[in-house]
Amino acid sequence: MTALSESALMVRAALEERGLETPMTSKVVSREEKKEKIEYHMREILELLSLDLTDDSLMETPHRIAKMYVDEVFSGLDYANFPKITVIENKMKCDEMVRVKGITLTSTCEHHLVTIDGKATVAYIPRGKIIGLSKINRIVRFFAQRPQVQERMTQQILVALQTLLESDDVAVTIDATHYCVKARGVMDATSETTTTALGGIFKRIPATRAEFFHGIR
């Protein structure tokens, strides 16, 4: 088992304390064993759907899906994949809002295992620490790469950054298209879902909150 970084342990503990962690069991299974079992069961599913897995187009599909689940679209379930985080002392005494907008994300609806496609905007007010800008994108991606509900994902990103920055002054908003709405059920191809999580000064001070939302337009 890969040892978890201090950042990963801190973030996981903070989410568990707040009841915001993705529902998971404590069962420990190696990556290779996961792939083997997923491939086996995916083969059974596809055969039950009367697909011919001897066809050269489908032959490797169970293997591809297993690899995709473990190494890519659900890799955020494993905190060994939590990004390496660089947080540095705020020697420049920056005290104005830092906002990263248009962060693309692709996640998976945990109810139907179909795509959530969206963009996030994340902001914080620097206090004692600042974070490398690309790390914000990587944190968003980490929490997107697991079965999700958008409301929880928004809160997870907020708490992760609050924990790493040791400051409540963080804001997150996500606009996303849910393919469980677009491609099935109601079949609404144009609707989007917006979720927001605000902390500290963003929640307390209307002017700061307004500045955050104004910058998204």
Swiss-Prot record:
It is an enzyme of class 3 (hydrolase). Pathway: Cofactor biosynthesis; 7,8-dihydroneopterin triphosphate biosynthesis; 7,8-dihydroneopterin triphosphate from GTP: step 1/1. InterPro entries: GTP-CH-I_C/QueF, GTP-CH-I_N, GTP_CycHdrlase_I, GTP_CycHdrlase_I_CS, GTP_CycHdrlase_I_dom. It comes from Photobacterium profundum (strain SS9). One of its GO terms (biological process) is tetrahydrobiopterin biosynthetic process. This is GTP cyclohydrolase 1. Zn(2+) binds at residues 109, 112, 180. The lineage of its organism: Bacteria, Pseudomonadati, Pseudomonadota, Gammaproteobacteria, Vibrionales. It catalyses: GTP + H2O = 7,8-dihydroneopterin 3'-triphosphate + formate + H(+). Its EC number is 3.5.4.16. One of its GO terms (molecular function) is GTP cyclohydrolase I activity. Gene3D superfamilies: 1.10.286.10, 3.30.1130.10. Belongs to the GTP cyclohydrolase I family. Pfam families: GTP_cyclohydroI.
